[in-house]
Amino acid sequence: VDRRFATLIGLYCSWLLIASRLLIAANARTWLFERYPEAPNFLALLSPVVEGTSVNASNKLFFWSLTSALAGFLFGFDTVVISGAEKTIQSLWQLSDFEHGIAISSALWGTVLGSMIGQFPTDRYGRRKTLLWIGILYLVSAVWSGLATGLWTFSIARFIGGVGVGISTVTSPLYIAELSPPHRRGRLAGLFQFNIVLGILIALISNALIAQSGSEHAWRWMLGVEAFPALLYTAMCVGLPESPRWLVAFRNDTQGAREVLRTLDPDTTPEQLDQDLAALTAGRDTSHPSNRSSHAPFWSRSLALPIAIAFLVAFFNQMSGVNAILYFAPRIFELTGLAEQAALLQSVGIGVTNLIFTFVGLWLIDRLGRKTLLILGSFGYIASLGLCAWAFSTKTYWLVPGCIFAFIAAHAMGQGAVIWVLISEIFPDQHRANGQALGSFTHWIFAALLTLVFPIAVTQFAPEVIFGFFCFMMCLHLLWVFAMVRETKGVPLT
């Protein structure tokens, strides 16, 4: 017990250290900037100084964005942590294949529900309160999953966590986008995706460390330890301000919005505050043609283009096969002849690659733009998936791991970095949560369907056929990006 407890505490102290180092980086940035204003700003990537604002304001913006984005860490952790416990659960409770499927998929169906209903609390109760309740859902799910005594208690607990995941994909990117200035919005909103990938990697490492304890209750620790970061995230959400855009759009509270803007940057002048408030309230002027879509029903012709973009960017995200490849990576590697242990090691390598190239995507998104990253990612998809299909068809198996790693890199710096940012930018204030919910629901329903179909497809079709299909879909994706997607880099929200 002492060994398991030491492993657990050591792992999560490390996680807390990572979070603390990010916050220390923001404060260190302030000290360096004030002491050596002429020095290069090496930490600008994580906490960029927004042109026209003070360093203090930039740090607050980064801290609030990071706090909201930690919902993504829990999202990634919660989604992948089950991989270390599913075999033990099936044997422990003697589950049939159907019951096993219920246990494993319960969280995924929770995300579908969460993405469907996420717009309601986000608009009705506010972004801040919704983020706080997301943390509570994660906390309840983690503790309950670790203490579950059977299939149905376990499935309900995982379903609750899935609801939190689904709502987080609606609220967190939206909240960050509404706080951020146009020329830094991509990088800050992209923190959500970066934390998803970080959560996935930490979950894989956590499972590996806890599994070494050899305890029959190791699976309970794997699931239960999520309570630590969930509790930290929930506590941090208490200090978040409400989105000034929500205060204006849904509460007509210009004074409250003014206070948030003043808290963000105490050094701002009254004249600048008036200008910022005028920009927030401009979208309520129905007499201006550019604002009429804000007051039209969501399912209306004026919103047809952003609705189509939100649906298709989420649809093509899944049609790349990324979730199937992430979930079933060991099985794919075993098809090439790798032993099970080597296949698992390759899977951890996927997590590391995903993290590194997500960071690259965040660095590029406000430099090259969203559409450019989607195009670059599409070319990477087509090349890696096409080569992978060829490698399977010619039995050149040594190429397959490299193709999979290249595919993950293309996804991480392309679609993965862009999807949540783009959806949060293309809708007006009154419909932003609806649009985010549409994109999130589309993402999760196709993820669920693909996860359901992929194991069957692997047994019914040759690998080259499956990868060839994904490659064809990414060719369609590239044509769609060229034809329909408009660049949103640096464009103010409406």
Set out the residue ranges of the language-model regions.
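Cytosol/matrix-facing amphipathic helices and coiled-coil assembly/linker segments
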Residues: L273-S287
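Alpha-helical transmembrane bundle of multi-pass membrane proteins
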Residues: A25, F42-R262, D285-T494
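Short intracellular "coupling" helices and adjacent cytoplasmic loop segments at the cytosolic face
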Residues: T263-D274
